[in-house]
Structure formats: structure tokens, C-alpha cells
Curated annotation (Swiss-Prot):
It comes from the Eukaryota. Belongs to the long (4 C-C) scorpion toxin superfamily. Sodium channel inhibitor family. Beta subfamily. Has the structural arrangement of an alpha-helix connected to antiparallel beta-sheets by disulfide bonds (CS-alpha/beta). Beta toxins bind voltage-independently at site-4 of sodium channels (Nav) and shift the voltage of activation toward more negative potentials thereby affecting sodium channel activation and promoting spontaneous and repetitive firing. The keyword Protein biosynthesis does not apply. Keywords: Amidation, Disulfide bond, Ion channel impairing toxin, Neurotoxin, Secreted, Toxin, Voltage-gated sodium channel impairing toxin. This is Toxin TpF21-Cocle. Expressed by the venom gland. InterPro entries: LCN-type_CS_alpha_beta_dom. One of its GO terms (molecular function) is sodium channel regulator activity. The keyword Transcription does not apply. It is found in: Secreted.
């Protein structure tokens, strides 16, 4: 996933750099 999903889908920051 791409974009900023804080708390969603297990992403802490941008899913690009920090995937679940």
C-alpha cells in the first residue's frame, strides 16, 4: 500500500517506507 496510513493496515508512517 502507498500513502500515510497511521494505525490503519498496521502502518506506522508511510506504508512506502514502513509496511505492516
Amino acid at each position: 500500500k502507498d500513502g500515510y496510513l497511521v494505525g490503519n493496515d498496521g502502518c506506522k508512517y508511510s506504508c512506502n517506507t514502513y509496511p505492516k
